[in-house]
């Protein structure tokens, strides 16, 4: 039986000298592994739709417990990413996070929409890279089950707390912190909290429709990254590479 899916390619792994295995994210089936036969051959029609960060339509069939591509065509290649190494490296970081957060055979349309919207923003919209990155990281943390509590100090209810507990994912006042508490706290400005509240709660299609001052933006960029890696308890090689490119350009 044939199955037609629309999917984003998150990872490409060589299988042999002719074939490759694709890790893809779908709307209705979650994360899947599919085999692309002959994709490594010269002039294969599967090259474009099967490349990393390609969004395409795939017709697959199941054989010996594995999905294999029968035919495929591209829906969006995000060419704006492929002409810019820095943007491409950030896109691959998004893909690595999405692969970790998603699960086999568990639908996650919100994660697919988030990743596609952020790739589109990098490729075609006039949105700062760091803003796209922070919005993706914070929203991905929510989809992974780590939605932060962003409405007042968790201890006293003060509406304007000035610290964010990275491990607990909540706001607090300096005076409410227990002297023997563990975890790292980062300072937050009201503008930073407002932006975080917007990112966590907005429609994905309007993810970048907010204003933020320069100092609050710098806080947001650092906090979103640190919060995601703290909650997922791991680093990302793609993130390290992206940051090395930024350092080289400074």
Where are these regions (language model features)?
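Non-catalytic alpha-helical scaffolds and adjoining flexible linkers that form interface surfaces
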Residues: 1-20, 25-250
